[in-house]
């Protein structure tokens, strides 16, 4: 059994066998999507979240063990490793406890205490610290020599040694840490010389602000830290000094007299010069780390919602990147997203060629039999939407407004240049907008998630940790939906379980050379795609109209024999099982349970037979803004308006109501009941009905509310 299995099982409240089997599968190279979907019998039906937590905790414990080994080696090299100390380090459970144990042995720059020791003052420090000598000044005379010119200098040196001892005392650090944990205050003050600058005003709420650190939300803490990094604010973390000193005095001072008085001075020095700065640094770092983790959670949750947004599906689309001066870039895409045609229209100021633009669009819609129009939500979006809605088409055409966050990043990227080497960035951007309507997931995987604009303080968090979490989110979403093996780009394929950039490129190259895949088993002919990668990826790849209908389902090829046996027992074909509910009702799942195939897998198989390759995403809905509200001046307090959720943060949700400025629904205005997490009430791109609560024309701020309103 793995050394960490029992601890992980206890911490996560999971079955020990489930944890052990999961670690074995992970260590064997299994991906989280594959393990959660196709190894349910071994994991005890753990979901992706639980498996991810096991993997993360295993990594943390491994790193912690390496740190222990490094510390043991360092202390051993110094010749100070005792059996008792080794045992304490081996059994240590917390990183802070481990570092406290190491602190007395940690190599340091030359300190005041070290200088005092070199001057031979350690015996005097020990005598004073024992607090039994009634006349320490007299004893100090014996140490007056060399650079120690008098009694006071000797005693101060001895106090430096005592202060170091107090600072490194495990119990002292534990008690002071506990005071900070429960009572630390975070304080923010404006730097006076920056107060009146325009850039400082966005931090005005924190010019003179304080609250208990344990209650400080991640967005407030990160806002203060950003203000600090921009030179606007001074931020500090502190606790009650008197409370801390009281605890230290109780620990170290014994009675009254000359020596206890000297120790009292050393206690104050130890706290103010060593312990206090150490704790302030520790809790500043810890609180920011926790705030960053929460911010990354919010970003990952938002990204998941964006990636799993409802797709229009394979329809012919007109993609429009709106603009005023340079016009609107318009592209015609076929049902697979291929670019057929593009041109520019200029219905808006300064050109105002409304009639010419109308003829252009109506002709494109007719010539290319366009079924839907996707309009980017940036500059001139509302005006372009109104323009499109005023046109007459000879067949029904749906119109959608699509988020264009990151489209400009894509249009200038290597990926876009590969796809459209002969088109400029404006055409590429319009294509991206059109494709996002057809299949948001397939298009958004081409863009760095950090460019999509659905996070909070994303530039203030650990960028490596952010990338790791966002990549995990993309992988989870891609595999949850499944990928069309014959149409997917190399970028989309690279996120499929068991693949990656090299194998995904090899699949695309094989497809170009040999034509469309007709069965999953052909994947084994792709260069460098062996049995292990095939086992990991096959069930997440779909082949519509394949010879074997299971190749267009989430049934794993290793389970095909089970399905064939079911069909044989029912006296029908696999196709019949899929088409006929009557045939499926004949199946007794218990008859097919084996050592490796249990009820969880069999239940999943039946669900897939009912609807092979089902898409977990919702159906897309058409949305329209209030036609009477087009800019900030049209708004009035009390108005009830339709809107689209564009971003979700810890403090609320931003909503586009069609006036070129998103409004904010504060968390307290999201519902008639208490809301702890905005994500429990609203989702990205959700259509909502809101009431205008407050308007600030100077700062272009709109406060909205959903309280007392029936959600759409």
Which residue ranges define each predicted feature?
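Duplex nucleic acid-engaging cores and interfaces of nucleic-acid transaction enzymes
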Residues: 50-53, 60, 64-74, 78-319, ...
């Amino acid at each position: 059994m793995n050394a960490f299995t029992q601890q992980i099982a206890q911490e996560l409240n999971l079955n020990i066998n489930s944890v052990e089997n999961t670690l074995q599968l992970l260590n064997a190279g299994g991906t989280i999507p594959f393990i959660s979907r196709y190894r349910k019998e071994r994991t005890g039906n753990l979901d992706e979240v639980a498996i991810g937590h096991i993997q993360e905790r295993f990594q943390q414990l491994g790193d912690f063990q390496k740190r222990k080994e490094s510390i043991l080696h360092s202390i051993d090299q110094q010749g100070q490793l005792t059996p008792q100390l080794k045992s304490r380090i081996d059994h240590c459970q917390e990183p802070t406890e481990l570092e406290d144990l190491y602190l007395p042995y940690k190599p340091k720059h030359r300190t005041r205490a070290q200088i005092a020791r070199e001057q031979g003052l350690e015996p005097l420090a020990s005598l004073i610290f024992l607090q039994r000598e009634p006349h320490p000044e007299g004893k100090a005379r014996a140490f007056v020599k060399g650079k120690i010119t008098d009694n006071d200098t000797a005693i101060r040196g001895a106090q430096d040694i005592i202060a170091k001892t107090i600072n490194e005392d495990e119990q002292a650090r534990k008690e002071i840490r506990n005071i900070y944990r429960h009572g630390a205050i975070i304080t923010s003050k404006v730097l006076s010389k920056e107060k009146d600058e325009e850039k400082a005003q966005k931090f005005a709420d924190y010019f003179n602000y304080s609250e208990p650190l344990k209650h400080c939300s991640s967005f407030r803490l990160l806002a203060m830290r950003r203000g600090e990094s921009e030179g606007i604010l001074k931020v500090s973390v502190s606790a009650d000094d008197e409370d801390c000193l009281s605890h230290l005095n109780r620990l170290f001072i014994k009675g009254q007299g000359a020596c206890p008085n000297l120790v009292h001075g050393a206690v104050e020095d130890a706290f103010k010069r060593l312990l206090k700065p150490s704790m302030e640094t520790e809790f500043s770092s810890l609180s920011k780390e926790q705030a960053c983790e929460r911010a990354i959670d919010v970003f990952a949750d938002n990204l998941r919602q964006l990636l799993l947004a409802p797709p229009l599906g394979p329809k012919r689309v007109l993609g429009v990147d709106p603009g005023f001066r340079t016009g609107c870039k318009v592209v015609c895409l076929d049902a697979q997203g291929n670019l057929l045609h593009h041109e520019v229209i200029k219905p808006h100021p300064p050109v105002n060629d409304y009639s010419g633009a109308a003829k252009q669009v109506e002709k494109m819609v007719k010539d290319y039999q366009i079924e839907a129009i996707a309009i980017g939500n940036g500059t001139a979006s509302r005006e372009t939407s109104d323009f499109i809605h005023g046109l007459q088409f000879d067949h029904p055409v749906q119109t959608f407004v699509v988020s264009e966050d990151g489209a400009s990043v894509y249009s200038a990227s290597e990926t876009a240049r590969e796809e459209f080497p002969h088109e400029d960035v404006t055409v590429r951007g319009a294509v991206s907008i059109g494709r996002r309507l057809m299949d948001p997931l397939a298009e958004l995987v081409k863009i760095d998630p950090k460019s999509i604009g659905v996070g909070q303080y994303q530039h203030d968090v650990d960028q490596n940790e952010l990338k790791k979490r966002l990549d995990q989110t993309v992988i989870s979403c891609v595999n949850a939906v499944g990928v069309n093996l014959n149409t997917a780009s190399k970028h989309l394929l690279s996120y499929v379980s068991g693949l990656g950039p090299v194998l995904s490129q090899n699949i695309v190259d094989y497809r170009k050379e040999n034509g469309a895949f007709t069965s999953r088993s052909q994947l084994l002919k792709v260069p460098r795609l062996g049995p292990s990668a095939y086992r990991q990826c096959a069930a997440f790849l779909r082949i519509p109209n394949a010879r074997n209908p299971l190749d267009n389902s989430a049934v794993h090829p290793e389970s095909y024999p089970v399905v064939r046996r079911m069909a044989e027992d029912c006296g029908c074909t696999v196709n019949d099982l899929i088409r006929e509910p009557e045939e499926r009702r004949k199946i007794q799942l218990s008859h097919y349970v084996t050592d490796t195939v249990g009820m969880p897998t069999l239940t999943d198989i039946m669900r897939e037979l009912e609807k092979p390759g089902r898409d977990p995403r919702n159906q897309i809905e058409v949305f329209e803004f209030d036609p009477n509200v087009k800019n900030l001046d049209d708004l009035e307090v009390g108005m009830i308006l339709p809107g689209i959720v564009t971003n979700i943060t810890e403090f609320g949700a931003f909503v586009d109501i069609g006036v070129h400025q998103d409004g904010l629904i504060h968390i307290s205005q999201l519902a008639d009941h208490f809301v702890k997490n905005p994500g429990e009430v609203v989702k990205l791109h959700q259509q909502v009905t809101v009431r205008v609560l407050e308007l600030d024309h100077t700062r272009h701020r709109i406060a909205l509310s959903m309280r007392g309103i029936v959600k759409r």
